[in-house]
Structure formats: structure tokens, C-alpha cells
Amino acid sequence: MQIAHRIGAGDDVGARRIMKQGLAVALLYSLVLLSIGTGISRTLPEWLGGESRICQDAFHYFLIYSLALPVMQMNLAAGAMLQSSGNMRLPSILHVLMCFLDMLFNMFLIFPGHNIRLAGITLLIPGMGLGVLGAALGTALAQLVIMICMMYFLLARSPALHLRKGEKLCFHRKDLKRAVCISVPVAVEQFIMSGAQIMSTRIVAPLGMIAIAANSFSITAESLCYMPGYGIGSAATTLIGQSVGAGRHDLTKRLGWIATGFGMAVMAVSGAVMYLIAPWMIAVLSPDVAIRALGAQVLRIEAFAEPMYAASIVASGVFRGAGDTLIPSCLNFCSMWLVRLPLAAFLAPRLGLRGVWIAMCIELCIRGVLFLMRLAFSKSWDKADKRHGTKQLT
């Protein structure tokens, strides 16, 4: 966000200074997470209530995931910095490529070698047969390849942010203080939301293997519906941030409403499509009839929440672009911990997985209403906009 402000103000030198500080801090932070993750990787599956037959595979997966955290963190940081410079297309293309690489690596690492017949010709498909461990390694390798590409385009090819001779890494107290004020609420929010996801898993785990599998596949299928919202939210962050940096405070609220309305419209359409083709979406992911039936039911429940989910996603991006992160983080915390989790814990023993997703649907609608109310009636995010305006960037 600070990079977008600097570029909007025409201060490319300041943008590069913040970029280098941000990459250094992100790397150090990811190393801390790596240490914590590897330390708890063996016992975490048991804490979450996993059955003994899956705990060993879960340990292997989470261990590889933890070891890959620095790569993932630098990948995310580089992509966000490219987006903040106004280059939305390249990170999106690279993330799509990462998905294809993930599938390709998984195909070779998860399954053993086998023969297939294609047009009367027998082909040998090599494979290592590593199972769950192969899935983790495939994802980590895909992240590594794309991280290298992201860093190359950021540090060598970006018109505004590529490295220049004579510009060394140095930490500025003012930059770090502003970064802490903006990022700490977001970091705490992500930590709390991750904890909430763990608690959700804990609520689903006792419902049995079919419910666990249906829940996992449904989350994967639903991501096709809400990913456009996150893309629009990222674009909104850049637009608002550069408007702030340029001193165009008159544009911030108008762009905020345009982006939020557009996101809601897109996800309303994708939600309607998801409702219609839910059985087919789950069928692609699982051959099990029971998983297909349960997964389709919960996807259709969630489809009704997609427009309001979009409101919270995009409006959050708008607020972040203006430097307003504390109140949105509090709204996310309250809706997740005070609405979704208690309601899911109450409904799960009575309605099973359907109850968990009903709780999710209700919570997302409430969250969307809260974000729309803040966008409409609160002026404090406009004040946050002015606090990070051009006078502070000189």
C-alpha cells in the first residue's frame, strides 16, 4: 500500500526504498513462521482431532508446507508489490501458471508410474508415488518456480521498482513506523482468521471422513467463485492507494463504491452459476457418491452469501488502499469469532456439515453488511486517506 502511495505521488525512489525494506522484513518474518511451523508440525494433527490413520500424512504435509513458507512469503510479497505499482496482469498470469505447475508436479510426485493408452498408443507416465508427501512437494516446487519469476520481474524488469545502482538497503524509522501502524492490524487479523479456520476444522473433524472430504472439496470448488472478488479487491487497493498518493482524495470514495459494486455483481453471477452446477463441480473433484451429494448441498447453501462476501472482500481492499486497516480487521474478527464459530459449533451436532455451512453463509452476509455500512456512513477511512496523503510523502 505504501508503494502505491509513493508511486501515485511520483516518488519512485521512495517506492524502491520501501520495497527493499518490505522484502527484508517479509523474509525475516517467514523464517520465524518456519521455525514455529516445523516445531508444531508433528503434534498439530492430533490437536485438531484428526484420526490416527491420517496424522502421519498430515504431519508430512504440514512439515513441507512450513519449510516452504519463506518461498511462499516472498512470492506473495513480490506479487503484491508488482500489483501496487499498477501491474495487475503479470502477477495474475504467474499465479495461473503456478496452478498449472502445481497440477503437473502433483501428477508426477503423488502417483506411481503407470501406462495409459492414447489413440491406440501405450504411453508410460512416470511417477514417484509419494502420495500426500508428493502433494506437498509439488505445491512447494510450483511456489518456488513462480517466486523466482516474480522476483525477476520485480527487481529487474519493473519500470518503477527495478533495482538501481547506488540505492542500498537501509531501514528508515518513519517508513517502518508507518508500516507497523498499517500492517499490524492486518497481521493480527490474518493470525486470528487462521485460528478461526483451525477451529472450523476442529468443528468439522468429528463429523467423519465423508464430511471432512466434502468440506475440503467444497472449499476448493467455492474458491472458483470468490477468486474474482479478491482480484477486484487487489485492484481496488492499488487504485485507492495511487489516488491517495496523487492527492486525489475526491476519487477515493467514488472508486471505492465502483469497485465494491462491480465485485458484488461479478460474484452474484458466479454464485448463481455455482448453485446451478454445484453437483458437477464436486463430481470433478471426487468419485464418491456420498461426498458428491453432501458437497453439492453445502455449495448451494453458500451460493446465497457470495454477493455479500464480495462486499467484504472488495471493501476491505478499498480501506487498505486508504491506509485504514484497524477497523476492518476488527470487523472480520468479530464476525468470525462472535458469529460463525459459535453458530457452527451449535449447528454442527444437529445438522452436520450443512449446519457448519449455514453458519458460514449467515456470517458472510453479516460481514458484508458491516463493511457496506462502514463504506457508506463512516468518514474515518477518508481521514485515514488524508493521514497518508501527499504531505507525508514529501
Cite the ranges covered by each PLM segment:
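Alpha-helical transmembrane segments of multi-pass membrane proteins
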Residues: 52-78, 289-315
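Interhelical loop/hinge segments that connect adjacent transmembrane helices in multipass membrane
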Residues: 123-125, 139, 148-193, 380-394
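Small-residue-rich hydrophobic transmembrane alpha-helices
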Residues: 1-35, 72-91, 201, 214-278, ...
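Membrane-interface helix-loop junctions in multi-pass transport and translocation proteins
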Residues: 100-147, 284, 293, 336-369, ...
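Transmembrane helical elements of multi-pass membrane transporters/channels
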Residues: 64, 75, 142-146, 150, ...
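Interfacial/gating helices of multi-pass transporter permease domains
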Residues: 18, 52-57, 132-133, 175-182, ...
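Short membrane-interface helical motifs at transmembrane helix boundaries
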Residues: 32-63, 119-121, 269-292, 296
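Helix-terminus/linker motif at the lipid-water interface of multi-pass membrane proteins
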Residues: 45-52, 108-113, 122, 126-130, ...
